[in-house]
A protein has these predicted regions:
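Glycine- and acidic
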Residues: 1, 42, 98-106, 129-135, ...
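N-terminal entrance/gating region of PLP-dependent enzymes' catalytic architecture
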Residues: 1-131
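Short, conserved micro-motifs enriched in small and acidic residues
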Residues: 105-109, 113, 137-145, 231-234
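Short loop-beta-helix segment that forms the pyridoxal 5′-phosphate
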Residues: 122-146, 191-192
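Conserved PLP-enzyme active-site core in the AAT-like
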Residues: 142-308
Length: 310
């Protein structure tokens, strides 16, 4: 199974030939097909005898790949998920061929070192202190959940008698925030946005103060969105940070989609306030054009995350 045979070498050449041709050409405008249609053409692809490398590559290149949207095509930029650059795709091949495991320093010191360098760069452009730190996780859903678990863990220490915990966000927040709330068994406080459809500190302060005054529920996190997936809206992060700080509430920024806009001087001002976040996420596989999928999760005080998740 792990021998480099003549057959494997021939397959490697075919893989490289296909990969180079795909990278050199303009991205195709492919699209989905129905399950029934695909099954009629391919039948069962998992068999007792196996298809073999050559046939498997043929199935992929001639059928499966053509039934997928090419998210790196300029006309598909609105699909958001991923548009890796040529360099990213090539180094994805290099990393895969190297059989790396970056889960701990013992097994993958070099990989972890490289990841830490990337995290440090993101910390620098976001304006957080050098003491901040983070980790890469598999997608924004996991990043948001991880940060919100830390947020709740912190506030539990000072408000042990709270009846129900609550996350405050806007109606435009990503569905992963609601998913995180379900997993954590906490409530969601959806707050009205301003005339520009941005969540701001004034509206959030009013909603939270009213909730705290009339119920035994307590908001443990305010989530600001840095680039909503529907309209690309960046919330008023500066005023949200101020509201959170005044009430000793964790401020998390979901920048999975749009926070990479910090790299563009023309729109950098929209993200003012992210430097005051207790945590944020950004997906390099989106506007940083890395391979899918990668979510950078950053904490202002990484030792708090270590306490919660270990």
């Amino acid at each position: 199974m792990h021998e480099f045979t003549t057959e494997v070498e021939e397959l490697a050449k075919a893989v490289m030939e296909y990969s180079l041709a795909r990278l050199k050409s303009d991205p195709p405008l492919d699209g989905p097909r129905s399950e029934a249609d695909l099954y009629a053409e391919l039948g069962n692809t998992i068999t007792a005898a196996g298809l073999g490398g050559k046939e498997t590559l043929k199935v992929f290149t001639e059928t499966l790949a053509l039934a997928c949207i090419s998210t790196d095509h300029p006309r598909n930029l609105a699909f958001i998920p991923s548009a890796p650059s040529e360099y990213s795709n090539l180094f994805d091949l290099v990393v895969g061929a190297s059989s790396l495991y970056g889960g701990s320093w013992q097994e993958g010191a070099g990989a972890v070192f490289a990841e830490n360098q990337a995290i440090k760069w993101l910390i620098d452009i976001a304006g957080l202190p050098s003491s901040a730190g983070g980790v890469f996780v598999q997608g924004g859903t996991m990043g948001n959940l991880s940060a919100l678990v830390v947020a709740r863990d912190q506030v539990r220490k000072t408000h042990p008698d709270t009846q129900r915990w609550v996350i405050a966000c806007s109606a435009e927040s990503h569905s992963s925030i609601t998913s995180a709330a379900h997993v954590m068994d906490v409530d969601i406080l959806k707050i009205e946005t301003n005339s520009e459809l941005r969540l701001d500190g004034e509206h959030v302060a009013k909603a939270i103060d009213e909730l705290h005054a009339t119920t035994n529920k307590r908001v443990f996190a305010i989530v600001g969105t840095a680039g909503s997936t529907n309209l690309g809206i960046v919330d008023d992060l500066a005023s949200l940070a101020k509201t959170a700080k005044e009430r000793n509430i964790w401020f998390h920024v979901d920048g999975a989609y749009g926070l990479a806009g910090l790299c563009a001087p023309s729109v950098r001002h929209l993200y003012q306030g992210v430097e005051d976040a207790d945590s944020f996420i950004v997906d390099p596989h989106k506007w940083l054009f890395a391979p899918f999928d990668a979510c950078a999760l950053v904490y202002r005080n990484p030792h708090l995350a270590k306490q919660t998740h270990t």
